Design a protein with these regions (language model features):
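N-terminal glycine-rich FAD/FM-binding segment characteristic of electron-transfer flavoproteins
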Residues: 1-353
Length: 353
């Protein structure tokens, strides 16, 4: 589908990802951002709900900002598979002509988004950290038309070492994927209702359809760092994988979870799913300990909205202190164990009383 008349494309659409009849958090976050973008464009937010027997989820989408829900419900959509889901979303785009389409940068979204963008012949910017409406080019260039009300999609590039702002001025829809935790949900409006429109273009299984023989769900006994209320995060300054034991001891006393910077993952000390930052996860815990972390902008972007930030670093000029609410300049190998012991003693005293 080549865009012939851009003016025909209206509205902000959000792919409302659901798994096992439960709306994913990223869908609610994107509805919040979609509401903001739609207000600037003076249009509506539409959630595209794809699955089987999922109509009951529409009210929740309305509570989090959807003005309208387009429901594509079919037995072929019971479990995510690339071809039927791509067919469903592409068919919606071709019929309704949205100006903007937002998809979560989840395992599903990273597969679905680019497949659909190729199918409808438009561009897609992946793993965005900022979405806003503005002019493009950002600065007027003599002799070149500056287009207004464009979706400006900002994302880290070159391994997070630079930030790129990208637009898609000549094609519609403008498509972006966004990492979970980057955008914020709106406060739910209890009892809100959305207009529901059911649409099914039909499904004809072909050689692109895979057959799912069995679904094996991973079981984890660890807390997702995006859900943790207290994070004890370590950086290169921790020194080694073994030395993370002192951070784990502190986290245990606090009832928190250990996380880390990209340098730690690059060194093989901790797995990728514990990484905080632009190329990791965006977190907003109640308390964030930044231990042995210098405070590179890429890391700060992933944790600066924490309620309380405590930084421990031997370098008093480390940028992390610029965003910290409390800072301790000192050797983490001495400071952290001492802090852990003090907290243990305080807990024991409280328990005794």
């Amino acid at each position: 589908m080549v865009t012939n008349n851009i003016e025909e494309y209206k509205g902000v659409y959000v792919f409302a990802q659901q798994v096992d009849n439960e709306i994913s958090g990223i869908a609610l976050e994107l509805l919040g951002k979609g509401k903001e973008l739609a207000a600037k464009l003076e249009t509506e937010v539409t959630a595209v709900l794809i699955g089987y027997n999922v109509k009951n989820l529409a009210d929740k989408l309305a509570e989090y900002g959807a003005d309208k829900v387009i429901l594509v419900d079919d037995p072929e959509l019971e479990t995510y598979r690339t071809e039927p889901y791509a067919h469903a979303l592409a068919s919606v785009i071709e019929k309704y002509k949205p100006e903007i389409v937002l998809v979560g940068a989840t395992a599903i979204g990273r597969d679905l988004g680019p497949t659909v963008s190729a199918r409808v012949q438009t561009g897609l910017t992946a793993d965005c950290t900022v979405l806003e409406i503005g002019d493009f080019p950002l600065v007027a260039i003599p002799g070149q038309e500056q287009k207004h009300n464009q979706l400006l999609m900002t994302r880290p590039a070159f391994g997070g070492n630079t930030i790129a702002t990208i637009a898609c001025p000549d094609n519609r829809p403008q498509m972006a994927t966004v990492r979970p935790g980057v955008m914020q949900k709106i406060a739910p409006i209890a009892g809100a209702k959305a207009v529901i429109e059911e649409y099914n273009h039909g499904f004809t299984p072909n050689n692109k359809y895979v057959t799912i023989k069995e679904v094996v769900k991973a079981v984890s006994d660890t807390v997702d760092i995006m859900d943790a209320k207290i994070l004890v995060s370590g950086g290169r300054g921790v020194g080694s994988a073994e030395n993370f034991k002192i951070l784990e001891d502190l986290a245990e006393v606090l009832g928190g979870t250990v996380s880390c910077s990209r340098a730690v993952v690059d060194n093989g000390w901790k797995p990728k799913d514990l990484q905080v930052g632009q190329t990791g996860k965006t977190v907003r815990p109640q308390i964030y300990f930044a231990i042995g972390i210098s405070g590179a902008i890429q890391h700060v972007a992933g944790m600066e909205e924490s309620d309380l930030i405590v930084a421990i670093n031997k370098d008093e000029t480390a940028p992390i202190f610029d965003v910290a609410d409390y800072g301790i300049v000192g050797d983490l190998n001495k400071v952290v164990p001492a802090l852990t012991e003090q907290l243990k003693a305080a807990k024991a005293e409280k328990a005794a009383n």
